[in-house]
Amino acid sequence: MKKNRLLLIALLLVWLAPSFAARVDTLLVKSPSMNKEIKVVVVTPDAALGKKAVSCPAVYLLHGFGGHAKTWIEIKPNLPQIADEKGIIFVCPDGSTSWYWDSPKDSSFRYETFVSSELVKYIDGHYKTIADRKGRAITGLSM
């Protein structure tokens, strides 16, 4: 009887305990300058979700040459946990093989404009960010 009661209490505690888990979204974000959609992975901490959401800083993580939008999630699988622990929104755009610059000859390669302007506006408009340059950072692999 005591074992059953203890098991029931343990199950209730697990069931009633709040679960905190960052949300990982894979999006297609329209780039007006390139006239195409770019894949972007956004990791949103629990703090920036729901009715009591607070504004969180956004860190833009750029992959290295040959990478893609999911590279950071693959090499750092605990990124959602870090997002929750630190209260950071991680934004991981697919930069293709662009080196994140604007080509003067090819209008389909304007990744600097996309990352520094278009994507920032999209993220600030769709996520609970600190919508100011003081609330943003950018870094990457092999930069």
Stretch-by-stretch model annotation:
Residues 9-10, 30:
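Generic detector of short alpha-helix boundary/capping microenvironments
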Residues 10-20:
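Hydrophobic h-region of N-terminal signal peptides that target proteins for export
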Residues 1-7:
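Bacterial N-terminal signal peptides that target proteins for export
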Residues 21-143:
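Non-catalytic cap/lid and distal C-terminal segments of serine-dependent acyl enzymes
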